[in-house]
Each structure stands twice: as structure tokens, then as C-alpha cells.
């Protein structure tokens, strides 16, 4: 892990825990090695650094290309491992970069919805993340951030001291159909979309509190 990244993560962790009374649940679920995708909901500009500080491994982020137009913002984003991507989903270069990072054993954070939710609720996933999962074959770790839409709503420049929670789900591998390699056209696109929808479903299953231990059934 690069020294600059480690330093920035430390600052964000201090900010997250002191200003937002932040809590992180199930961070130990992240794989210790190998490439994987972190898939999270997106409701605020606070999300990328807050999700990144919760990860024990260095992560790479997909970020909207328009955020890089200012040279200073672009430099900061790139130093924080952000990769510019076009919102319309047609950025072949960014997709190749994602696949290369995953192939090199890196953790890549993606937002399946493609943009911030306007009201804090989960939105429909786009097929792009499904395509990357299919082409890379890596596992996906669903994660969810709670409260950032209230901490930094749309149109606001300064964050409020609202409590935040980041929670990780179980890593999972998508069960591809037996004939996946033969699929083409609309049938292949349907699988990509189904992968994306499954990821969003698992994100939606996460709740902002610790998991309850399973109760052992008593024998009769």
C-alpha cells in the first residue's frame, strides 16, 4: 500500500469516526488477497473516501470523468486511485482498466447504480458492473453506506455531523448458466443485467446494525 494512500486513509478514518461517529461492520469479510469488486450504493460525494477508509486493503475507484476537469481535483482524485469513467457506460478504456486491475489482484470499488441516488433510496443497477464481473470472473463484496445522503445532501458544500455506518456483506460468486460461453447479443446482455440486479439485491439486504448471531435450535 502506497504511503500517500495510507496517509489519506488515516485522515479519513479520523474524520469518519470523530465527526460522524462512524461505525464499520464486517470489515473482516474482505478477501486478504486476489482481485475482487466492492459494490456499493451511491448517495453522496462523501461515499468514495468513506467507503475507502473502511477497507483494510488499498482500493481503486471508478469516478465520473467530469470530476477530473479541474486540474487540482483531478490530481487529488488520481492520487486516491480514482479512474475516470463516462457516465453513459460506453467507456471501453475504463472497462479495460478495471479488468486489468482485477487481473493484477486489486480491489476495485464500483457503484452499480452509476450515479448518486436523488432521494437516498436504492436505484436500478446498470449492466456495466455485470459485464465486468462476467469478464473478470472475480467475486463481489456488497457494501452499503448509511446516512451520507443526510451528511452531505445534493447542493450542499459542507458536510453535517450526521452519524454514518458502513457495512460489508458476504463475498459471493455469481452462478453463471452452463451455456454462458455460447450466449450472444440480447441473451448475453440479459445475464449482465441479472448479475447487476443480484448485486443490488444483496446491497439492499444489508442493515445499519451488527448481524445477529444465528440461534441454535434446541433438540426436542
Language-model region placement:
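Short Gly/charged-rich anion-binding patches and loops
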Residues: 10, 25, 71-72, 96-97, ...
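Non-catalytic C-terminal accessory region of glycerolipid acyltransferases
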Residues: 3-4, 93-220
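Short, basic, glycine/proline-bearing loop/turn elements
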Residues: 11-13, 79-85, 112-116
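N-terminal membrane-anchoring alpha-helices
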Residues: 1-21
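Short gly/ser/thr-rich secondary-structure transition/capping motifs
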Residues: 17-25, 148-150
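Catalytic core of membrane glycerolipid acyltransferases/transacylases, capturing the structured
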Residues: 17, 27, 31-89, 97
Amino acid at each position: 500500500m502506497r504511503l500517500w494512500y495510507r496517509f489519506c486513509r488515516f485522515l479519513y478514518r479520523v474524520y469518519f469516526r470523530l465527526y460522524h461517529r462512524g461505525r464499520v461492520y464486517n470489515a473482516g469479510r474482505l478477501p486478504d488477497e486476489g482481485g475482487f469488486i466492492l459494490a456499493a450504493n451511491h448517495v453522496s460525494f462523501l461515499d468514495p473516501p468513506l467507503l475507502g477508509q473502511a477497507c483494510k486493503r488499498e482500493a481503486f475507484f471508478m469516478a465520473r470523468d467530469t470530476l477530473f476537469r479541474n486540474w487540482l481535483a483531478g490530481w487529488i482524485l488520481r492520487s486516491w486511485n480514482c479512474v475516470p469513467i463516462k457516465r453513459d457506460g460506453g467507456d471501453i478504456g475504463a472497462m479495460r482498466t478495471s479488468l486489468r486491475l482485477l487481473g493484477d489482484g486489486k480491489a476495485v470499488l464500483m457503484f452499480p447504480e452509476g450515479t448518486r441516488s436523488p432521494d437516498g433510496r436504492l436505484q436500478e443497477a446498470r449492466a456495466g458492473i455485470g459485464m465486468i464481473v462476467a469478464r473478470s470472473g472475480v467475486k463481489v463484496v456488497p457494501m452499503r453506506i448509511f446516512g451520507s445522503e443526510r451528511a452531505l445532501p445534493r447542493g450542499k458544500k459542507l458536510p453535517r455531523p450526521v452519524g454514518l455506518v458502513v457495512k460489508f456483506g458476504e463475498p459471493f460468486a455469481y452462478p453463471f448458466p452452463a451455456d454462458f460461453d455460447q450466449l450472444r447479443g440480447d441473451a448475453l446482455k440479459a445475464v449482465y443485467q441479472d448479475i447487476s440486479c443480484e448485486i443490488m439485491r444483496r446491497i439492499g439486504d444489508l442493515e445499519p446494525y451488527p448481524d445477529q448471531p444465528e440461534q441454535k435450535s434446541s433438540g426436542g
